[in-house]
Amino acid sequence: MATDQTVLRHIKELADEEHRLYERGKLTDEEKARLKAINVALDQYWDLLRQRRAKREFGQNPDEAEIRSPGIVEKYEN
């Protein structure tokens, strides 16, 4: 079961990895693919955190929040 703290910790780990990749400058194809995967995962975890906070705000159980598929969270940006 994820808590807000574990979600935030995972977001920080992903963001740190993202920054390390950007600092390298020119990326290999594998690193570019990893960067894209990190960005999708970050979107998913930020969405999960928003869901948890919204459920809590409206008196629902935040533990019922679930990670949504990339197809769903990526559509928010479009």
Q: Can you say where each PLM-predicted feature lies in the sequence?
A:
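Extended, charge-rich alpha-helical interface modules
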Residues: 1-78
